[in-house]
Swiss-Prot record:
GO molecular function: ATP binding; ATP-dependent DNA damage sensor activity; damaged DNA binding; mismatched DNA binding
Entries under InterPro entries matching the protein: DNA_mismatch_repair_MutS, DNA_mismatch_repair_MutS-lik_N, DNA_mismatch_repair_MutS/MSH, DNA_mismatch_repair_MutS_C, DNA_mismatch_repair_MutS_clamp, DNA_mismatch_repair_MutS_core, DNA_mismatch_repair_MutS_N, DNA_mismatch_repair_MutS_sf
Name of the protein in question: DNA mismatch repair protein MutS
Ligand binding (ATP): 613-620
Amino acid sequence: MTQDLSKHTPMMAQYLQLKAQNPDILLFYRMGDFYELFYDDAKKAAALLDISLTKRGASAGEPIPMAGVPYHAVEGYLAKLVSLGESVAICEQIGDPATSKGPVERKVVRIVTPGTVSDEALLPERQDNLVAAIYEEKGVFAIATLDMTSGRFLITELPNKEALAAELQRLQLAEILYAEDFSAAEILNNYKGLRRRPVWEFELVTAINLLNRQFGTQSLAGFGVEKAVVALCAAGCVLHYAQETQRTALPHINSIHLAQNSDTVLLDAATRRNLELTQNLAGGTENTLAAVLDKCVTPMGSRLLKRWIHQPIRDLEKLKKRQDIIDTLQKEQRIEPLQPLLQNVGDMERILARVALRSARPRDLTRLRTALAQLPDIAKNAKNLTASLDALVAQIGDFSELHALLERAIIETPPQLIRDGGVIAEGYNAELDEWRELSAGATQYLENLEIREREATGIDTLKIGFNAVHGYYIQISQGQAHKAPMHYVRRQTLKNAERYIIPELKTYEDKVLKAKGASLALEKQLYDELFDLLMPRLGEMQLAAMALSELDVLTNLAERAESLNYVRPTFSLQRGVNIKGGRHPVVEQVLKDPFIANPVFLNAQRHLLVVTGPNMGGKSTYMRQIALISLMAYIGSFVPADSAEIGALDRIFTRIGASDDLASGRSTFMVEMTEMANILHQATENSLVLIDEIGRGTSTYDGLSLAWACAEWLAKKTQSLTLFATHYFELTSLPSQLKGVANVHLDAREHQDSIVFMHSVQEGAASKSYGLAVAALAGVPKQVIQLAKQRLAHLEEISLQTKEAHDNPQGDLLFAADLQETPQIQPLVAQQSELEKALMSIDPDELTPRQALEALYRLKKLMA
């Protein structure tokens, strides 16, 4: 906004200067009890927040559009703007109005952005809130993520933009920073909170210097990240952005970690979506894996569990330690005593971040005090059980002196804000107690003065009051105002009363106001000093919060295992998945009837199962439960099965269901083929691959050919551990032609025209698809079902003839080259016979006995 500031009022000139420094974001400009917005900001905020758009006088000869929000309710408005992906610069008055000449000095004290907020009211409690920078150089893609609410700082390098897209989908970022010349901007479509940043923010030397200054180091070698140069460029950008928005030191960001894909079982975007890990296909959180597993008692534990679910690990030693702890907590019956203690710890992780940023509120400190008070009892209940658990407890530490400090310093239930006063406890500071005593004595003094003045003047309506504008006053009703003594100085005239001041009251007012002001100022100083006293042990408290989060997750998983009858899985270094009595962890919780448990057996000699069976028979549920059980094992959880042995896995792929991608202009079939191509390129012999109904979106010949070729590729080329569900019965001949392939089917029983789904997995191929029976269940008209039966009988006859003619082992009608001419099929709506016409013409209520007898003979004749 280029303006000639000389044409504007001094206040608007000040506003425009501040706005020029923050051109792309909303500016909340503090004026008294309101944050005001002007010009285009006002129009935008009025639309987004549904607040009134008004005008404020004129500046440079033009009316000024204006909108505002009360300062005491600003958090709610900020929360809405942040949820919409907007950023806001908060501009406060920092000068003293009493001494200012011209506009009070103001400056932007912080910038609230979706990815860097730390205020409790602006954050999703049980979900990570991340800002990330992405960068590409010479074909290498990188992402650096920062959690401002915990200080967690991670970098990753990725081989291609598809891997980056999958990572973005996993992280569900609140804000994404990218360079102006980023080469793959198309993958950012449909994301909000996008911020284009200048290229210089991604320069390597600048990034390394910035990171070293932040961590107080000379080199990044100690973090093991020095060779990840592309990722360091991204890290420099995101750290610069954090410093720019927070306008304060960031002591809780004290390390950086390089995440390697080789450390995790990789899940692509389609797999996360299809398995409904933390979000269901409708976009909600109900009936997801997280909804079943997450009964954590702390928000920070809940967030950690979701990270585990989205990023299962391959470190078997670490997994076995998690299993040991879960096992021990169950056997030693420590779940029940630990969970209430952990619940009282609350969100210690985010409270510590606000302490580091010096934005913690009084109630944050009381919650921290409560959290620290739980630590001795938590340690007592968790230690001396296993070496793994002892190592975790050792991180919790002893903070008894900090707990004692907060106990002395903060009252039991403080007000929400320090500016309201009354936060620091009595006895903590002698000077503060003196000022408070002076201020508190005002009530008694004023009562005595009021009684004395009434008696001296004889005015029974006289009373002493106070307001923020005029201070203390003596009020007399209009009917008795003529009795006011000469030394009473009129201060204000009201409709029914006069207000006066006397020298004694004015002197006392100055003294009391000074005491209140001094009390509030000293209290704010003491409160700020508390941060200084907490800061030396911030790093240790962060480690404790991490350990408590993990203990919460493991205690939660122990409770889930106990409540839901889960078993401890075992791991094998060999390829394979061997599950007995496996159950779908989500479906079994929502079914009213008992869930039918099923086995699966895959290994190097039996690595592809062709899964057949009717629609609604449970094929998709069966395949998903195998993936979910495997994933649960790789986060360290117990699993819903009678027993489970899981071999080495590097990736889990799913190709289940599809719909049009309208935003990208891709059809259902194109989406399906894109996902399939990704699997065929990326899958290895250690990948678990689930394919459901590939090839449905095109012609029958094309679909069957593609399904056959994909199955053959997976069986022969990649030899991945694969479940391949299909309605193409031609594929059931694959086991006779390829090594390592077997048939299984979901059982069903047909009785007359109805079908009963048994939901049990049996060896061998299904005998038929039961498609017509399922169609009848869905309410398809009976005449349509009858016509379909006729068509089916004809096609099956042709298929049989083709097999006999060509001795074709696959010999299905779909590969027959000589389909005969289709015979005449009965029309959908048949013509009425003479008998039916005669019967329809009879009205029984109108017939005499003789006419009825004649009609009966006529109908009998027509039948003959």
